[in-house]
Amino acid sequence: MSTASVFMDRVRLEDGYHEDDLPFIQHSLTQLFTQLERFDPSMVHIGLRVKDRGRPGMHTSVEVCVSGLPTVIGVSHLADTRAALEDAEAKVVSQLREAADRHHDRHHDRRPRQPRH
């Protein structure tokens, strides 16, 4: 099973998205899926929302929850549905990298304590 299909199973289509959107969603979220490869898929939840789809003021969001990390949300106000999803995805990927790096630094770069004499 490909990385994309594993993580597509973790996607919740919320307000404004439909099953018909799945092919373009899978293609649009490839950077996110690549970034998520370091995590167990069962620890990942992805929510997609679009408000006022196809109208001025459209609001697209991608929300990613990875167990043990803070929830990250990317938002776009671009008018094109595909471009907005990719814009929101790029924002989430950037935040996810930062959160994962901070988490890694906190848990793996601790200096051993010096014994007391």
Q: Positions of the model-derived regions?
A:
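N-terminal, polar/charged subdomain of small-to-medium soluble alpha/beta proteins
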Residues: 1-117
